[in-house]
C-alpha cells in the first residue's frame, strides 16, 4: 500500500497514507467528533437569527399577557432554548448516523475497492489525526471527469499544523494522476474555516443551495466549490 512523503509542521511530524482496516475505529472517532463539533455553532447561529429573537421574546410575552405569570414566561424561555438546541443537534446527528450506516461501515469496500476513489488518513505519533475521502462524481457535466472530496476532518488537537491543507493537496494530486478534470466539494456557510482553506487553495464557488427546509429556516446554505485543472 503506497505511503506518502512525511510532512512536518512546526509542532509535530505527520504523514499521509491510504486507509487501512485497522484504522477504522479511530477514523470513525475523528469523523464523528468533527461533525458533531458543528452542533454548538449551529445553535449559536440559530440564536442570532432575528426570527429566533422574536420567538424568544414574543411567546413568553404572550404568556405573561394571558396568564400574568413571569415565572411561566421564564420556564417557557428555558424550554424554547432546549427545543432550539435539540433542533440544532438533530441534523448533525442524522448526518453522522447515515454515514456510519452506509459509506463508513466498510471503508475499504466503499472507497479503496472503487475505481477512481480513495480514502486517506493523516497519522501522527502512531495515531490517526485526520481523514479525507474522494469518489468519482456519478453524473458529471458533459465532457468532464469529476472527483468529489468528502469527509475532510482533523482532530481538534492537531489543527493549525497544515494537515487539512495537506490532505486536500493529496486529493488534488490523486485527481491529477487519475486524469480528472475537476475536484468538486460542498461545504456550508457555517464552516468558515473550511471555506477559507478551499478558496485559498484555488477552489472557486460555483453555486449554493439549501439542502432541506430545516437549513432554509435556520438560514444555513451549502456552498458548491470546484477546482479545475489547467490542462482540462
From Swiss-Prot:
Q: Which GO terms describe its molecular function?
A: protein-lysine-acetyltransferase activity
Q: Which GO terms describe its cellular component?
A: endoplasmic reticulum membrane; endoplasmic reticulum-Golgi intermediate compartment membrane
The EC number(s) this enzyme carries: 2.3.1.-
* Tissue expression notes: Expressed in brain (at protein level).
Q: Which family would the database say this protein is a member of?
A: Belongs to the NAT8 family.
Give the EC class as a word: transferase
Where does this one sit in the cell? Endoplasmic reticulum-Golgi intermediate compartment membrane; Endoplasmic reticulum membrane
Phenotype of null mutants: Nat8b-deficient mice born with Mendelian ratio and do not exhibit any apparent physical abnormalities. However Nat8b-deficient mice display activated reticulophagy and macroautophagy. Disruption of Nat8b ameliorates the proteotoxicity phenotype of a mouse model of Alzheimer's disease.
Residue ranges annotated as transmembrane are 63-83
Q: What is this protein called?
A: N-acetyltransferase 8B
Domain N-acetyltransferase, which positions? 79-224
The residue spans the entry assigns to the Lumenal side of the membrane are as follows: 84-232
Instruction: State if Transferase is listed as a keyword.
Output: yes
N6-acetyllysine-modified residues are where?
A: 109
- Gene name, Swiss-Prot/TrEMBL: Nat8b-ps
- Looking at the record's lineage, which domain of life comes first? Eukaryota
Described function = Endoplasmic reticulum (ER)-membrane-bound lysine N-acetyltransferase catalyzing the N6-acetylation of lysine residues in the lumen of the ER in various proteins, including PROM1 and BACE1, using acetyl-CoA as acetyl donor. Thereby, may regulate apoptosis through the acetylation and the regulation of the expression of PROM1. Acetylates and stabilizes BACE1 immature protein, leading to increased steady-state levels in neurons. By acting on BACE1 expression, may regulate amyloid beta-peptide formation. N(6)-lysine acetylation in ER maintains protein homeostasis and regulates reticulophagy.
Question: What does the record say about PTM?
Answer: Acetylation on Lys-109 modulates enzymatic activity.
Question: Which N-terminal stretch is annotated as signal sequence?
Answer: none
- Which controlled-vocabulary keywords does the entry list? Acetylation, Acyltransferase, Endoplasmic reticulum, Membrane, Signal-anchor, Transferase, Transmembrane, Transmembrane helix
Which Pfam families does the protein's record reference? Acetyltransf_1
PROSITE patterns for this protein: GNAT
According to its record, how does it sit in the membrane? Single-pass type II membrane protein
Amino acid at each position: 500500500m503506497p505511503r506518502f512523503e512525511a510532512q512536518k509542521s512546526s509542532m509535530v511530524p505527520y504523514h499521509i497514507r491510504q486507509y487501512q482496516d485497522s484504522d477504522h475505529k479511530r477514523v470513525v472517532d475523528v469523523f464523528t467528533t468533527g461533525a458533531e463539533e458543528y452542533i454548538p455553532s449551529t445553535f449559536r447561529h440559530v440564536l442570532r437569527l432575528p426570527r429566533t429573537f422574536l420567538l424568544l421574546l414574543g411567546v413568553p410575552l404572550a404568556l405573561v399577557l394571558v396568564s400574568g405569570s413571569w415565572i411561566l414566561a421564564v420556564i417557557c424561555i428555558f424550554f424554547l432554548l432546549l427545543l432550539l438546541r435539540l433542533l440544532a443537534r438533530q441534523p448533525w446527528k442524522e448526518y453522522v448516523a447515515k454515514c456510519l450506516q452506509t459509506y463508513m461501515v466498510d471503508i475499504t469496500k466503499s472507497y479503496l475497492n472503487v475505481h477512481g476513489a480513495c480514502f486517506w488518513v493523516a497519522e501522527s505519533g502512531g495515531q490517526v489525526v485526520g481523514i479525507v475521502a474522494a469518489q468519482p462524481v456519478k453524473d458529471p457535466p458533459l465532457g468532464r471527469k469529476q472527483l468529489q472530496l468528502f469527509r475532510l476532518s482533523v482532530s481538534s488537537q492537531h489543527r493549525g499544523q497544515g494537515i487539512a491543507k495537506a490532505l486536500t493537496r493529496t486529493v488534488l494530486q490523486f485527481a491529477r494522476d487519475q486524469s480528472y478534470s475537476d475536484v468538486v466539494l460542498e461545504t456550508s456557510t457555517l464552516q468558515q474555516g473550511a471555506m477559507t482553506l478551499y478558496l485559498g487553495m484555488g477552489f472557486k464557488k460555483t453555486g449554493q443551495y439549501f439542502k432541506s427546509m430545516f437549513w432554509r429556516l435556520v438560514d444555513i446554505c451549502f456552498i458548491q466549490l470546484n477546482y479545475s485543472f489547467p490542462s482540462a
